[in-house]
Structure formats: C-alpha cells, structure tokens
Amino acid sequence: MNRTERFRRVALLMASFLRNLAYLRAFKDVHARIPMDWTRDFWITQGGNCTDIAVLEWCKLFADRADKHHWSRIVADLDAFKPSLLARLGMEEAAYSDYVTSVRRYRDKFVAHLDSDNVMDIPMLDIAERAVFFYHQHLTTQEVSDPLQVFRPLPSSSAELTLYFEHHCRAAAHTYNEVLPPLRTI
C-alpha cells in the first residue's frame, strides 16, 4: 500500500468515527423518547453499536501504535505532531495517556472481548473528536500535497470535515425525530 492509499484509509477511518459519533450524539438527545415496547432493544443496540464503532475506529488512529493507520506511522514529523496534538487538546502527556488507556480498556474489555470486569466505563468521546479533527487538519495542511485529489469524495479541509459531521448529526436527528414518538409529559 502506498502513502496516498494510507492517507485515504486514514480519512475513511476518520469519517467512520465522526459519522458514528454524530449518530451517537443524536441518539443521546432522543434516548428518553425510546419506547418501552418491543422496539426498545433495537434502539439501545443501535446506540451501543455507534459507540463501539466510534471507539474501534479511534483506537486504530490513536491507541494502537502497531496499527498501520496510527498517527505515528503516518505523519512525517513525529517529534512535532504529538506536542501539537496535546496543545490542541489542552492536555498534559499523562492525562492524554490515561485517556487513551481508558478508551483502549473499554474496547478491549467490552467491545473486542467480554472480560470479567463488572463495570462498563464508556469513555466520553469529546477528546477523541477533537483529536480526529486535529489529525485531519494536520494531514490536509502538512502531509498531503493535494487533499482534494486524495480524499475525494471525503472531506478535504477542516471546514468540509465540520460540515460533514454536522450533516450527519442533522440527518440522524431528523431520522430519530421522524421515527420515535414524542416525549410524553404528565
């Protein structure tokens, strides 16, 4: 696989992460409206699947240094990338490392395997989201000479990535609002 193909695959993982995160956020907004009937399992499973796929995709990009899509195997200037990422996230190295460990732990203990842990600690994905936006911006401004050519039809700029995410948030919210009954008040 050549470098251009790797960039494209990284962009596909980013898009998948953001789509699933968008669907998850829209799901959380309507969670209280999920009916207590035979469809409930469907809705709960759908929300859980979006969480799990987002976590899996993010781990490929940020948590598994051995993965061929991990940022450390993609970016040219390794010494500059991580400090810039931490600065963008507003995190110290130790806090970021703890966050990566928590996301990886959820993936390993509950998504990839069902280990013996009794408590599922689902990670918040706000930091993961900001990391993906940073990584994408880095690729499109510093690594890829022609982002439009490499990423087409995926977002090839930060502005396009934001629109992509917002579009999927709106699409999911629209779908949920069309299908789920309104919240009943007493």
Residue ranges and their predicted role:
Residues 1-99, 122-186:
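Amphipathic alpha-helical interface segments
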Residues 93-120:
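Histidine-centered, metal-coordinating catalytic motifs and their short helical/loop contexts
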